[in-house]
Amino acid sequence: MKVDKLKSALSNYPTGIVCVFSKTKGFYNAIIVNSFTSVSLNPPIVSWCLDKKSSKFKVFKNCKNQTIVILSNKQKKFANHIAFHRDKVSDLEFNKILKMSICDLYCAIFKKIKIGDHFTFFLKIKKISGIKKIKPLVYYKKKFLTI
């Protein structure tokens, strides 16, 4: 099957957007993800997938902890910036991002599985912070949209 055809078909399904962070060498490495999903409530496990060819693959594959930030409709500019221009943020920027997000999940790596051309990360949620009643940022037809 052609990858472009598959991507086109799957782009018809709207998904939520998260930013995954992992801190190394004083900075937060960041990646925008639409493959985030809940896996288990007890224990609390979530997952997301990363292409092995991604420039960010090595950083996330080797980390022990990750923070999942569920992005709000006020973070479209930030999502585009991370997705297309930048992959690291400072402590100050990270804290500003958290203030605008819907909520933050502080996680430890539970399991990593190689599937095809991707790795799936299973994360155990250790702490949930900042649940706010604001609308999410979504991804549909290859664009970030707000509801």
What are these regions (language model features)?
Residues 1-147:
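Basic, polyanion-binding surface patches
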